[in-house]
């Protein structure tokens, strides 16, 4: 799944480990999302990441 997680984390100077620690999501789940290997992340996972990063799910996901 294409997403903007890498760009957003870079802008906020955060690491996957920071997101994992603050959201309670596993580092492996977030790493798969970061490297765009996550095939079907749940809505809950996307919402937790988006909430922590203070963006919408639409902002997190690449459209087009």
Can you name each region flagged by the protein language model?
Residues 1-17:
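A short, Lys/Arg-rich alpha-helix, primarily the initiator
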Residues 8, 42-43:
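Short, Lys/Arg-enriched C-terminal cap helix and immediately downstream tail that follows
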């Amino acid at each position: 799944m294409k997403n903007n997680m890498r760009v957003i984390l870079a802008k906020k100077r955060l690491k996957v480990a920071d997101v994992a620690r603050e959201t309670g999501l596993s580092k492996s789940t977030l790493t798969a999302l970061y490297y765009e290997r996550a095939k079907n992340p749940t809505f809950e996972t996307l919402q937790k990441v988006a909430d922590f990063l203070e963006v919408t799910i639409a902002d997190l996901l690449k459209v087009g």
